[in-house]
Structure formats: structure tokens, C-alpha cells
Swiss-Prot record:
Parts of the chain that traverse the membrane: none
Subcellular location: Secreted
Domain spans labelled Expansin-like EG45: 61-167
Disulfides per UniProt: 64-92, 95-162, 100-106
Source lineage: Eukaryota, Viridiplantae, Streptophyta, Embryophyta, Tracheophyta
InterPro entries xrefs: Expan_Lol_pI (IPR007118), Expansin/allergen_DPBB_dom (IPR007112), Expansin_CBD (IPR007117), Expansin_CBD_sf (IPR036749), LolPI (IPR005795), RlpA-like_DPBB (IPR009009), RlpA-like_sf (IPR036908)
Gene assigned in the entry: PHLPI
Residues linked to a glycan: 32
Ranges of residues in domain Expansin-like CBD: 181-262
A single cellular component GO annotation: extracellular region
Organism (species): Phleum pratense
Annotated PANTHER family: EXPANSIN-B1, EXPANSIN-B3
Signal peptide: 1-23
UniProt family annotation: Belongs to the expansin family. Expansin B subfamily.
Record keywords: Allergen, Disulfide bond, Glycoprotein, Secreted, Signal
UniProt name for this protein: Pollen allergen Phl p 1
Length: 263
């Protein structure tokens, strides 16, 4: 009969085998990249996905809930962040400068990407799985496809303030399925920190703020027995603590699957 130590050894070896076979993380994620970590360049691995010149996901969306990320103002300069970058959705909308110096096709010049999707592949403490367009943007002019053919490379990154093109307004998308007793909001195009960590609404003529809960990605929601009629003022808080109010941005008679811009 096998000894208990022999059985334990077999179990351990089997666990190691399963870890190798099924991709149990071998490289733990790094510390979260916050809005206040500073401007030091850090090392990361980078890959790309989707069409070579596309915005990543087939539907031009992603785990943050944004749509049409191939169009302005994201314009396909998008990517997935791993755990310390995506942060269970709280990293959605944050901006990073990235650059590479190897292979030779790299320009060495930084470009800005927006976090719009999630990536949990455990290949490095920090990992950006970029759109094909964003990956190619790190190349010397004319060498975009040559760089994409590398597949995976080392890059340097740092978090930066988001600076959307002039005229871009913070936008609140009332998600599909919203009704007077259920409201889900996606907040996007936030300058500065870029990401949102809290959302509250206030009905016109009332003093009380109603806190929304995180749903998924960049979407916040509330279920209430009392009907929400609007107009609503929306207050959103970024990771750095900045609070901004968009007065009466959601009008009376609001509709689901509709976007409303701040004034």
C-alpha cells in the first residue's frame, strides 16, 4: 500500500501538470496602476488581437461596455488591460502612453491608448492586449505590419491624463432594458483621470442624491420601487477624487438605448 507521503507527492505533481496544461497563472499581476502612481515608465508585455488595422473586438465593443471604439474619439487606439490595469472595470476609460524600442520596427515614440477591454492572460505583471491599430501605431511609419508580425513584444508604459479632442463631451448612455424602475448608465469620454469610481443621480427638485451600484465594466445601475421620471443630474467621481455634476443631463421622458451629452 502506498505511503501517505507518496500519495501527497503524486497529488502535487498532478497539480503542477494541471497548472501547466490549463494555464493556471504563472506570473502574478503587479500592483494596481492608480491615478496617483506618478509618471515613471514601467515595463509590460504587449500583444494584439482582432483585425490588423481594427479596434480589437469583432463588435468594436469590449468588456467596458463601450460601443463603436473604432470611431472617434477612441478611433481604434484601444486595448485590454490585465488585472492591475482593468481593475474589474474601474480602469475603463483610463489612458496610457506606450512605446517600444525593439524590434527595429519600433519607433520609440509614445502613443496614447484607452482601456476599453479586459485581458487576464497571465504572461506578465502588466500586459496590454492592444487593437491591431494601436499595436501598429508604435511602429516607424510604413513598418506597422512588420511590427504586428512580431506578435508579442516588450513595451514601456505610464498612466497619463486623458485629453479628448476639443468639443468632445462627457456622454451618458442609458443602457438597453432601462425603465422607470431600473436605470443603467454608461459614462464615457471623461477628461483627466478617464475612469469613474462612483456615480450618483439626483431628480430635479429634490435634494437627495441616489447612489448607483457597479454593474459591469463602465456601467452603473440602480433598481428602485419608486419610479424615476427625470430630468436627472448625474454626478460622477473619478479615481483621483474629482467630482463633476452634469445638471439635468438625462431629460424628462428619457429613453433606453439613448446617449445624452453633458452641456
Amino acid at each position: 500500500m502506498a505511503s501517505s507521503s507518496s500519495v501527497l507527492l503524486v497529488v502535487v505533481l498532478f497539480a503542477v501538470f494541471l497548472g501547466s496544461a490549463y494555464g493556471i497563472p504563472k506570473v502574478p499581476p503587479g500592483p494596481n496602476i492608480t491615478a496617483t502612481y506618478g509618471d515613471k515608465w514601467l515595463d509590460a508585455k504587449s500583444t494584439w488581437y482582432g483585425k490588423p488595422t481594427g479596434a480589437g473586438p469583432k463588435d468594436n465593443g469590449g468588456a467596458c461596455g463601450y460601443k463603436d471604439v473604432d470611431k472617434p474619439p477612441f478611433s481604434g487606439m484601444t486595448g485590454c488591460g490585465n488585472t492591475p490595469i482593468f481593475k474589474s472595470g474601474r480602469g475603463c476609460g483610463s489612458c496610457f502612453e506606450i512605446k517600444c524600442t525593439k524590434p527595429e520596427a519600433c519607433s520609440g515614440e509614445p502613443v496614447v491608448v484607452h482601456i476599453t477591454d479586459d485581458n487576464e492572460e497571465p504572461i506578465a505583471p502588466y500586459h496590454f492586449d492592444l487593437s491591431g491599430h494601436a499595436f501598429g501605431a508604435m511602429a516607424k511609419k510604413g513598418d506597422e505590419q512588420k511590427l504586428r508580425s512580431a506578435g508579442e513584444l516588450e513595451l514601456q508604459f505610464r498612466r497619463v491624463k486623458c485629453k479628448y479632442p476639443e468639443g468632445t463631451k462627457v456622454t451618458f448612455h442609458v443602457e438597453k432594458g432601462s425603465n422607470p424602475n431600473y436605470l443603467a448608465l454608461l459614462v464615457k469620454y471623461v477628461n483627466g483621470d478617464g475612469d469613474v469610481v462612483a456615480v450618483d443621480i439626483k431628480e430635479k427638485g429634490k435634494d437627495k442624491w441616489i447612489e448607483l451600484k457597479e454593474s459591469w465594466g463602465a456601467i452603473w445601475r440602480i433598481d428602485t420601487p419608486d419610479k424615476l421620471t427625470g430630468p436627472f443630474t448625474v454626478r460622477y467621481t473619478t479615481e483621483g477624487g474629482t467630482k463633476t455634476e452634469a445638471e439635468d443631463v438625462i431629460p424628462e421622458g428619457w429613453k433606453a438605448d439613448t446617449s445624452y451629452e453633458s452641456k
